[in-house]
From Swiss-Prot:
Catalytic reaction list: N(6)-carboxybiotinyl-L-lysyl-[protein] + acetyl-CoA = N(6)-biotinyl-L-lysyl-[protein] + malonyl-CoA
One Pfam short name: ACCA
Protein name listed in UniProt: Acetyl-coenzyme A carboxylase carboxyl transferase subunit alpha
Classification via SUPFAM superfamilies: ClpP/crotonase
Primary location class: cytoplasm
UniProt source species: Bacillus cereus (strain G9842)
Name of the coding gene: accA
Length: 324
């Protein structure tokens, strides 16, 4: 498993423990006490490192090459998944996957950004950066879900929508804007979960819902830290400073009222334990459906509208702006 820079002390200690255990198996010497001491030290070290993650550490975890993807969670959370392809206008975009599935026996529509697990798949899926046809495919599935009264679950995991010439020619901004408009008025429940990076309009194109949740080490921002640093300071190398200033973590966004709940992750990140992470997401989905149960279509849309009207509100007292 690939290690991140801040994890090196933990990885080195784990390797020492493993080597000592292997040596003990092949010798007559007993190192059980030494192993116990090292394991206690490892537990304390993990608590110290993973319990005090900096913003940039979380950015690295969110981008981890082995972080679970939409299809991983679909496999663990749903049954009878049937993937649907194409936007019926131009083509199919592998950077967004979606289809019909069952959640605890209930028909649902599941949609999400999809990154690759290796170079070949990343190229096929454009590194999880959708073209307009991806967003139009997603909208087609959402409108189908509305027609057949199926709840929608969206998994968000993208650096952003693809900014290439072909995407712009085919109406990238219109496709995203159309999704924002249409999702705001859907008459079925919509649950959105940020599972990795939630980057810019590319994330928002699947991000208008009744409840917005984030995994503990995911990020959600208007631009990547590197992009913000390049614009503000003409130096992408200041990405760490930008990340700190941008308030992009789940804890920051929960405090700001942008998201509803934070889904806990395994120590070190979701990639450490996919089964446990899927259980944590499952608990949150069940809880959210319970909260949405019994709400009429009109009330659903009204509450969704009120939710988004509250985001970003700023109030000033006369004293704070110098008015007597």
């Amino acid at each position: 498993m690939a290690e991140l820079e801040f994890e090196k002390p933990v990885v080195e200690l784990r390797n020492k423990i493993r080597e000592l255990k292997d040596y003990t198996k092949n010798s007559q010497m007993d190192f059980s006490e030494e192993i116990r001491i090292l394991e206690d030290k490892l537990e304390n070290l993990e608590e110290d490192i993973y319990g005090n993650l900096k913003v940039w550490d979380r950015v690295q975890i969110a981008r981890h090459a082995e972080r679970p993807t939409t299809l991983d969670y679909i496999e663990h959370l749903f049954t009878d998944f049937f993937e649907c392809h194409g936007d019926r206008l131009f083509g199919d975009d592998a950077a967004i996957v979606g289809g019909i599935a069952k959640y605890k026996g209930m028909p649902v529509t599941v949609i999400g950004h999809q990154r690759g697990k290796d170079t070949k798949e990343n190229i096929r899926r454009n590194f999880g950066m959708p073209h307009p046809e991806g967003y139009r495919k997603a909208l087609r599935l959402m409108k189908q879900a509305e027609k057949f009264n199926r709840p929608i679950i969206c998994f968000i995991d993208t650096k952003g929508a693809y900014p290439g010439k072909a995407a712009e020619e085919r109406g990238q901004s219109e496709a995203i804007a159309r999704n924002l408009f249409e999702m705001a008025g859907l008459t079925v429940p919509v649950i959105c979960i940020v599972i990795g990076e939630g980057g810019s309009g590319g994330a928002l194109g699947l991000g208008v819902g009744d409840y917005i949740h984030m995994l503990e080490n995911s990020t959600y921002s208007v631009i990547t830290p590197e992009g913000a640093a390049a614009i503000l300071w003409k130096d992408a190398g200041k990405a760490k400073e930008a990340a700190e200033a941008m308030k992009i973590t789940a804890a920051d966004l929960k405090e700001l009222g942008v998201i509803d709940e934070i889904i806990p992750e395994a120590k070190g990140g979701a990639h450490r334990n996919l089964s446990k992470q899927s259980e944590n997401i499952d608990l949150m989905i069940r809880k959210t459906f319970e909260q949405l149960n019994g709400i009429s279509k009109d009330e659903l849309i009204e509450k969704r509208y009120e939710k988004y009207m509250k985001i970003g509100q700023v109030s000033f007292s006369n004293a704070s702006i110098g008015i007597k």
